[in-house]
Regions:
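Bacterial Sec-dependent N-terminal signal peptides
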Residues: 1-20
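Glycoside hydrolase catalytic-domain context in secreted enzymes
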Residues: 17-721, 730-744, 753-755
Length: 755
């Protein structure tokens, strides 16, 4: 009887397993994906690995109307996309820029044999800003200037909600590149030059997009950590240029943000980088995409290519003889999804049938893509319900405003700010009344969805006479005649607000000077803006510079001659209000630089965490060193740092300790400051940087208030990638530095001995 019971029990288990169906929502996403794979043909599996740009993105007239920088690329006009979707040969689309198209594409996918929904993605880099009417938050470089990861998480949550409400479920964000060359046009997409700051901001952004559990439930979407790896310090500052780096530099500088994204935030997807590292293009680098990413870091999601970068293994890198070989090598190396273009599908199917690519590799890639779709709930509701009005739009605008306020960096102030009841204000410059305030990765918005600097001043100073000269929002319109007019108007004002900088708008008809594939060999103000600034200063009236840019600009003349400088970066749709509030004293500035500002283009790459020998020699014809240091930013208040102490002066290699410092706001205003902790390893088996940021905390203090700020210092904060080619804490002398910026003059050093 006992034996019969066991047999019957086993039979019940077998029958139960046999009844399992991929439509059963009680199963895990991975279980459902595995079951669905068994019902799919090879062609349907490879179809999941194919992503195309949305048809409406490139329909006749649209590309030229938007001035789309990608519209001239090959393979955009896929005539038979509808048939491909019906055959199950498309797994995803990107740049679905209307909810109408999102619904139509998902309905089309339901006509396929298995009705597998599409994964619709978009570059929601700083808000769902490629969709008109959605919230355009400050760019990532602005957000890094806040040193406020929790605010970054909130923006991620709100962006995810707005994406869901427009039928989108996958954002190609955050950008985790470490930006160490201001010539590179994509600095504004990043969180700056530091590994820790980028790691924290990126991790919290992913938590916002995906949820803390990494399951994309509710109103969350799947995020994408990009670009793997080391594209932020390209040769010559040119996007996609080669990188030759040591494994030590890769692990200590470029990899930590991805480690945090994968191990802490459980990011669902990773995008490979345009560039090569050490002679191997990232899209064909098996060590990078498999040995490091999956085996060592434990990444369990899927890897997507960047825009047609698989083809560029042949056409740009000249690494393989043709695109067919590029497609096959990319799959062998670990790329799971191809972003945009024809011929990939046919090449991969043929490679499997010939035996070159095992079908198990296709199952791995398609299975991971399907698991994400199941986790997102797409199979339960493949066709999204689109609300007429975005939920939370007013609240999201307030978040965008607060982010803009916190990200503004005051670089200079001789007492001119905050403005003291002027009667006549002259607002001048091509960025004063322009949507350049939105930055890259944003479509033109309706005027009522954007507050420009001029709009902000009109609202903040309703009883003040405001004169303007905005040059039609075009940098190229600044000419000798306009400059002469500006000097005349400046002479009649009590104070002049000069809004200059760059233009990152990819869909603008005006000349771009910054953004993706817009790199420069000059870090001065483009066009005749420098002459404009000099003419206004020559009026003899107080002059405030508002710098609107996606990269660090070398404005040494302005530093010497302007009365005040506010680095606004690209603060988004509410930026004009935030700028006006700061300049008029309604808000106390509190942003800190997430990059080092070089003195001139000849001094890139200037970074704060350089090696001791970098400045053992000085430039012969100019001052050596940063124009402004990393972590720097002024306030209208004076913050005093005192009583910096360590809980221990000597520890073992596996021990932790605490560091603390008292911060006092000596007024005269309430304000925020960012307390920064740096560590210097004085001597080691390999040479070490002069300092490295290891912790930070944003604090708010009332006028006259004090607080004690305490940090835990763990062994992980003391370790390095030594000659043994592994992480370890090396015994010896360390210095803990506490203060308000990376400048030695703003830091208190505390010695620490590690035994």
């Amino acid at each position: 009887m006992k034996r019969i019971a066991i047999v019957l029990g086993l039979a019940a288990v077998v029958m139960s397993c046999a009844r399992k169906d991929w439509r059963d929502a009680s199963l895990t996403a991975e279980e459902r994906a595995s079951l669905l794979l068994k019902e799919m043909t090879l062609e349907e599996k490879v179809g999941q690995m194919c992503q195309y740009v949305a048809p409406c993105y490139v329909e006749p007239g649209k590309g030229s109307a938007r001035k789309n920088i990608d519209a001239t690329d090959e393979n955009l006009g896929n005539k038979d996309l509808s048939d491909k979707v019906r055959r199950g040969e498309v797994g995803a689309f990107l740049h679905v820029m209307t909810s109408t198209e999102a619904v139509a594409l998902q309905k089309l996918a339901q006509e396929s044999r298995l009705g597998i929904p599409l994964l619709l993605g978009i570059d929601a880099i700083h808000g769902n800003a490629l969709i008109e009417g959605c919230t355009v938050y400050p760019t990532n470089i602005n957000m890094a200037s806040t040193f406020n990861p929790e605010l970054m998480e909130k923006i991620g949550e709100e962006t995810a909600l707005e994406m869901r409400q427009r039928g989108l479920f996958w954002t190609f964000a955050p950008n985790l590149d470490i930006a160490r060359d201001a010539r590179w046009g994509r600095m504004g997409e990043t969180f700056g030059e530091d590994a820790l700051l980028t790691s924290e901001m990126g991790k919290y952004a992913i938590w916002g997009f995906q949820g803390r559990d990494g399951k994309y439930s509710g109103n969350h979407v799947v995020a994408c950590a990009k670009h793997l790896i080391a594209g932020g310090e390209p040769a010559g500052g040119l996007n996609a240029a080669p990188m030759d780096i040591s494994e030590r530099k890769l692990r200590e500088l470029y990899l930590p943000p991805f480690v945090a994204a994968i191990r802490d935030a459980k990011v669902g997807t990773v995008m490979a980088a345009h560039n090569e590292i050490n002679g191997i293009p990232c899209h064909g680098n098996k060590w990078l995409l498999n040995d490091l990413l999956r085996d060592e870091l434990g990444f369990d999601g899927f890897v997507v290519s960047d825009w047609m970068d698989i083809e560029r293994l042949h056409s740009m890198h000249y690494w393989v003889p043709d695109s067919t070989e590029a497609f096959v090598v990319s799959v062998e190396s670990g790329i799971d999804m191809h972003m945009q273009g024809d011929k990939y599908f046919e090449a991969v199917v043929a490679a499997v049938k010939s035996g070159r690519i095992p079908e198990s590799r296709i199952d791995q890639a398609a299975g991971k893509i399907l698991a994400v779709k199941f986790a997102l709930g797409l199979f339960e509701q493949p066709v999204p319900e689109i609300p007429e009005v975005l939920d939370g739009a007013a609240e999201h605008r307030q978040t965008a405003l607060e982010a803009a306020r916190q990200g503004l960096v005051l670089l200079k102030n001789d007492g001119t700010l905050p403005l003291k009841n002027p009667r006549r204000v002259f607002v001048v410059g091509p960025n004063a009344d322009s949507q350049t305030i939105l930055g890259d990765w944003a479509v033109p918005q309706s005027d009522d969805n954007v507050i420009t600097v001029l709009d902000g001043f009109k609202a903040a100073m309703p009883n003040v006479s405001i004169d303007t000269l905005c040059f039609g929002g075009k940098i190229s319109n600044v000419d000798a005649k306009g400059i002469q007019m500006a000097r005349f108007k400046a002479s009649a004002a009590d104070v002049n607000i000069v809004v200059v900088g760059e233009n990152s708008q990819r869909y603008s008809a005006f000349g771009r000077t910054c953004g993706e594939n817009c790199d420069r060999d000059d870090l001065s103000l483009p066009g005749m803006q420098q002459q404009l600034l000099e003419a206004v200063v020559a009026s003899g009236k107080p002059t405030v510079v508002v710098l609107m840019t996606g990269r660090a600009l070398s404005i040494g003349w302005a530093k010497e001659n302007a009365n005040a400088i506010l680095n606004a970066w690209e603060p988004g749709q509410m930026g004009g209000q935030a700028i006006a509030e700061v300049l008029t004293g309604q808000v106390n500035p509190s942003g800190k630089l997430p990059v080092t500002v070089p003195r001139n283009v000849g001094q890139v790459q200037t970074v704060y965490n350089y090696k001791h020998s970098q400045y053992s020699r000085l430039f012969a014809t100019n001052e050596t060193g940063a124009l402004w240091p990393f972590g720097y930013g002024l306030s209208y208040s004076t913050f005093e740092y005192s009583d910096a102490t360590l809980s221990k002066s000597e520890i073992g290699v596996s021990e932790s300790l605490k560091a603390s410092v008292t911060v006092t706001n000596n007024g005269p205003y309430d304000g925020d400051d960012v307390v920064q902790l740096y560590i210097r390893d004085e001597y080691g088996s390999v040479t070490r940087p002069v300092k490295e940021l290891k912790a930070f905390r944003r604090i708010s203090l009332k006028n006259g208030e004090s607080t004690k700020v305490e940090f835990d210092i763990t062994p992980e904060m003391l370790q390095c990638w030594g000659v043994s080619e592994k992480w370890s804490v090396e015994p010896g002398d360390f210095t803990i530095l506490l203060g308000s910026s990376s400048s030695d003059s703003d830091l208190t050093p505390l010695p620490l001995k590690v035994k």
